């Protein structure tokens, strides 16, 4: 939600009227950010559903985690197509700006006959033979063998995703929305897709369409709630910051392994455990370690020498924006694809979840800490992100794509 409310603030600053729509669990965050909220889906996704789903998802990995994600995507698609149009029609929405994961928005926009712009907050789901499937974790390989490998991977991915694809196709048929049976990129707007993924952190992809834009992340330094932290417990040693994100963070063994791997390295480990692991359930943690449920991530990254991450897009981009190299432990969904880009750009080292142990992780941490090239590469991408000014560029693209009058920021 943070990137979307950041983008919404920028559009409102430029004089445009903005409101949010979504399931009830989105409402407190949206209203807390100062925006109007119009909800739908309360029967199928009542308040509290997200926390229950995240609690289940927090302990899943690999194909099991991906399967659970596909199931919720199908449910969300059907609910969105059914319940969003009346809400948006009543609100007299002129255009939709929607997270790319919610492919139901494509069919909603078709029903309402309004333009759709999609935002790729995670790894973009644009499936072309030039790059590996986002969930594969495969290295970039531009030759013919690599493209054949990718094509096979997409066929397997399509088989795995067939419940979501079947639901989308059925709703499109019912609504009279034509689909190209040969195009695996169903549900993508041909107007604009804006990716937070910077081009400097992506694989080269000559197949991307002209309406795809790498803007880089949306940051304005606003909108995040204050998070208390025990700053007086910092020892002055170099900081290793570790977070497994907000979804797959229910693995106590991972946190214990991270603590063991980082002990005795002359650094202080700061771990954000998240909502599904407590200090009690994590058990005794080795070394010079500060473990908290929630941490002020941006502030700690600015002080960190290294970030240990699940390779979620938001944490990876925030680490890079701070010029901090990573050790990535991808678990499921698009995290292997993000981790593959960490390896490709040499902004860090990848330790796959299935091969994780303290010895292997310690080796990776030492490599990144001792080889200055990782930090230099991270700083290079940080400079590219700063120069790109992703938030302003995204707002420009929205205005240009929708042919909106360019507004001046409203002061006061």
Map each language-model feature to its residues.
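Donor-nucleotide binding loops and adjacent catalytic segments primarily
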Residues: 197-306
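C-terminal amphipathic helix plus adjacent low-complexity
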Residues: 91, 358-412
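Active-site-proximal region of nucleotide-activated glycan assembly enzymes
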Residues: 117-203, 209
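Conserved nucleotide-sugar phosphate-binding/catalytic loop shared by glycosyltransferases and other
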Residues: 19-66
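Conserved nucleotide-sugar donor-binding subdomain of glycosyltransferases
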Residues: 53-105, 147, 151-185, 189
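Conserved nucleotide-sugar donor-interacting segment of glycosyltransferase catalytic cores
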Residues: 74-147, 200-201
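A donor-sugar binding/catalytic signature common to diverse glycosyltransferases
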Residues: 5-8, 96, 292-340
């Amino acid at each position: 939600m943070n990137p979307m409310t950041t983008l919404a603030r920028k559009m409102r600053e430029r004089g445009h009227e903005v409101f949010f729509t979504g399931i009830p669990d989105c409402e407190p965050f949206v209203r807390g950010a100062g925006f109007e909220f119009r909800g739908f889906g309360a029967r199928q996704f009542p308040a509290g559903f997200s926390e229950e789903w995240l609690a289940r998802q927090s302990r899943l990995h690999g194909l099991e985690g991906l399967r659970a994600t596909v199931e919720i995507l199908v449910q969300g698609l059907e609910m969105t197509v059914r319940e969003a149009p009346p809400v948006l029609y009543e609100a007299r929405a002129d255009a939709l700006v929607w997270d790319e994961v919610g492919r139901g928005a494509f069919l909603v926009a078709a029903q309402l006959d309004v333009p759709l712009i999609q935002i790729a907050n995670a790894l973009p789901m644009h499936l072309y033979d030039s790059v590996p499937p986002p969930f594969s974790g495969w290295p970039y390989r531009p030759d013919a063998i690599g493209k054949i490998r990718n094509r096979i991977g997409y066929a397997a991915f399509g088989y795995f995703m067939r419940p979501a694809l079947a639901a989308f196709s059925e709703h499109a048929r019912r609504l009279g929305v034509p689909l190209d049976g040969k195009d695996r990129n169903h549900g993508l707007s041909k107007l604009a897709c804006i990716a937070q993924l910077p081009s400097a952190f992506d694989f080269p992809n000559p197949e991307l369409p002209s309406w795809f834009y790498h803007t880089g992340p949306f940051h304005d330094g606003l909108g995040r709630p204050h998070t208390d932290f025990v700053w007086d417990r910092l020892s002055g040693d170099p900081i290793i910051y570790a977070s497994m994100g907000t979804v797959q963070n229910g693995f106590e063994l991972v946190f214990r392994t991270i603590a063991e791997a980082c002990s005795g390295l002359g650094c202080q480990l700061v771990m954000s455990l998240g909502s599904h692991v407590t200090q009690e359930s994590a058990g005794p943690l080795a070394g010079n370690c500060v473990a908290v449920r929630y941490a002020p991530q941006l502030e700690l990254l600015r002080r960190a020498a290294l970030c240990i991450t699940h390779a979620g897009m938001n944490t990876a981009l925030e680490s890079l924006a701070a010029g901090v190299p990573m050790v990535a432990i991808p678990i499921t969904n698009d995290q292997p694809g993000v981790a593959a880009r960490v390896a490709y750009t040499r902004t860090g080292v990848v330790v796959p979840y299935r091969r994780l142990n303290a010895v292997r992780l310690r080796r990776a941490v030492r490599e990144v800490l001792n080889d200055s090239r990782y930090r230099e590469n991270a700083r290079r991408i940080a400079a590219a992100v700063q120069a790109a000014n992703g938030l302003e560029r995204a707002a420009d693209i929205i205005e240009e794509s929708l042919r909106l009058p360019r507004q001046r920021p409203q002061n006061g």
